[in-house]
């Protein structure tokens, strides 16, 4: 055996022995003979005995619990990319975004220069009640300094059981000394429909961050409000939505389908086929709809988009989705740890499984697949999409493909016309984000008084921010390149302005600003305005990535690189 191969399989052998041994106990019969181990039963009994040998005879003391915890992820990683193990704390944290609430102080923060910076204070939350403000720096929590601490450890200091107290030491802009606020932790809502608004007098827009416990209820509230404002057509934005609860996606898409339409079905080796159909009670069955997707749209997002596409209920716009078509069932241990085991595949109404290809035990390659798409040009041209899967047909006979995500009806490539190496370096080093944060911090009160994204945008256009950024970049070892600065002016202004509006305003303000020149959103609105959201079977379907499709280009990939990561506590 090749030494490298042997080394690679050693952890797996330990993992198999540990995991199986935990489940089977010590059901074995053996004896020693001349240094050999003879085991009457084979397979699982053999590895169970191996565990016993390690525990009783290994040269050093072995912490069997640690061995189990380390081995769990390794053995599951050999099955498929989505079967996974979470320890007790990890299990709770992993579903926090999907719960309706958590217990904390009620702030969103980011880490800048090793300091906890409050981005926003949740209205009506514990922190707001005692006077914590956006822009505050949280320096201490009780007697613990938070300076230089990793974000996950900061969250553990700020979160806690409802009713418990934490004393915050805060440095406020314009003051020298720390100010102290004692916050009583409470229930903080987790919102997944984080923005909705009218783009014009007819077009509603809803942004869905994930599919959590309250997402369906939040969507109904958003739709009701938009309906009251005169909505006649709708854009649902699922870009970057990694999924969540399947039953929530089913409830949501049910609102748009006539009675008896197949939404999704699941099937596995030990899981009989189970179908989910629309009940005909949806209030928006005839509302024209366009769904925006991209490579970050996965799982429940693909169930939603697949049901709309296969039932020819609306138009899918954007780029090919992630391609997660496996169903995990959580199985909890007594200590609170959880195994999420893949037990079935899900299939869209046409019968396609959109799970992209993977090799067992090659999780890293699977995670790198999106980079491979980017490198082969798929983000820029629909011609680069590999349609090697089996062909399926929608309800009216349009051809769709399985085996690798959902290909949109209208492809919107990423735009690189204004891209330069100067902009790329500024974005990927975080300097755009840092500059926007510093500017926001210095001008927070003035910007907040403007109230709307439109007013903030008009104000920022007069501030000559491009020149200010170039000077800021020079102070941080980013060599000034005037020609590239001008070529990338549109990108710089878009993301500097966007970050500032995001820092000072709400998600709604931020998305309203971006939507005005976002090619995918513009294309979606054009489809709706022309009455083309309901697909029709064409005699000859236009090939994705055609010249017409390339007229609409998106910069969302670069946007994701420049927006600061925000944490909730």
Residue ranges of model-derived segments:
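Cleft-lining beta-strand/loop regions that shape enzyme active-site pockets
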Residues: 2, 20, 31-43, 47, ...
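Conserved functional hotspot residues or short segments at active or partner-binding sites
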Residues: 353-354, 358-560, 567-569
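Structured segments of extracytoplasmic/periplasmic soluble domains
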Residues: 52-57, 61, 70, 74-78, ...
């Amino acid at each position: 055996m090749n030494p490298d191969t042997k080394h690679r399989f050693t952890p797996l052998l330990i993992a198999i022995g540990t995991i199986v041994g935990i489940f089977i106990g010590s059901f074995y019969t053996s004896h020693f003979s001349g240094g050999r181990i003879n085991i009457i039963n084979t397979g699982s009994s053999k590895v169970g005995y191996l565990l016993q040998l390690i525990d009783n005879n290994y040269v050093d003391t072995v912490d069997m619990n640690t061995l189990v915890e380390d081995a769990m992820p390794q053995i599951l990683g050999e099955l498929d990319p989505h079967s996974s193990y979470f320890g007790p704390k990890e299990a709770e944290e992993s579903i926090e975004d999907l719960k309706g609430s958590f217990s904390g102080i009620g702030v969103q923060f980011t880490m800048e220069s090793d300091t906890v910076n409050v981005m926003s204070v949740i209205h009506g939350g514990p922190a707001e009640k005692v006077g914590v403000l956006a822009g505050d720096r949280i320096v201490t929590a009780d007697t613990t300094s938070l300076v230089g601490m990793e974000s996950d450890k900061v969250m553990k200091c700020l979160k806690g059981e409802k009713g418990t107290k934490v004393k915050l030491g805060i440095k406020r802009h314009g003051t020298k000394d720390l100010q102290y606020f004692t916050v009583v932790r409470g229930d903080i809502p987790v919102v997944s429909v984080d923005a909705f608004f009218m783009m014009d007098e007819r077009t509603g827009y809803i942004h869905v961050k994930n599919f959590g416990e309250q997402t369906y209820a939040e969507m109904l509230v958003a739709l009701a409000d938009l309906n009251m404002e005169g909505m006649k057509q709708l854009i649902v934005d699922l870009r970057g939505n990694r999924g969540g609860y399947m039953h929530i996606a089913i409830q949501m898409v049910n609102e748009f389908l006539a009675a008896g339409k197949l939404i999704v079905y699941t099937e596995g080796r030990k899981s009989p086929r189970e179908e989910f159909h629309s009940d005909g009670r949806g209030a928006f069955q005839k509302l024209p709809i366009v769904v925006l997707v991209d490579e970050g749209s996965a799982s429940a997002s693909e169930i939603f988009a697949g049901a709309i596409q296969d039932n020819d209920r609306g138009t899918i716009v954007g780029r090919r989705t992630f391609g997660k078509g496996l169903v995990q069932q959580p199985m909890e241990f007594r200590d609170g740890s959880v195994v999420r085991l893949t037990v079935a595949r899900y299939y869209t109404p046409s019968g396609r499984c959109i799970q992209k290809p993977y090799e067992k035990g090659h999780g890293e390659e699977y995670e790198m697949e999106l980079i491979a798409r980017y490198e082969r040009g798929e983000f820029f041209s629909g011609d680069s999409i590999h349609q090697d899967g089996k062909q399926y047909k929608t309800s009216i006979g349009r051809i769709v493909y399985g085996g690798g995500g959902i290909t949109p009806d209208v492809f919107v490539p990423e735009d690189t016309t204004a891209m330069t190496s100067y902009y790329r370096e500024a974005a990927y080093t975080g300097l755009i984000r840092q500059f926007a944060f510093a500017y926001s911090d210095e001008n927070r009160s003035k910007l907040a008084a403007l109230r709307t994204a439109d007013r903030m945008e008009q104000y920022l256009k007069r501030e000559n921010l491009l020149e200010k950024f170039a000077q800021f970049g020079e102070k941080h070892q980013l060599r000034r390149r005037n020609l590239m600065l001008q070529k990338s002016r549109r990108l710089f202004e878009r993301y500097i302005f966007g970050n500032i509006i995001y820092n000072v305003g709400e998600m709604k303000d931020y998305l309203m600003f971006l939507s005005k020149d976002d090619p995918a959103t513009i294309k979606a609105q054009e489809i709706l305005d022309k009455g083309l959201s309901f697909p029709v079977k064409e005699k000859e379907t236009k090939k994705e990535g055609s010249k017409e499709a390339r007229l609409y280009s998106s910069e969302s990939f670069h946007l994701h690189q420049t927006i600061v990561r925000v944490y909730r506590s």
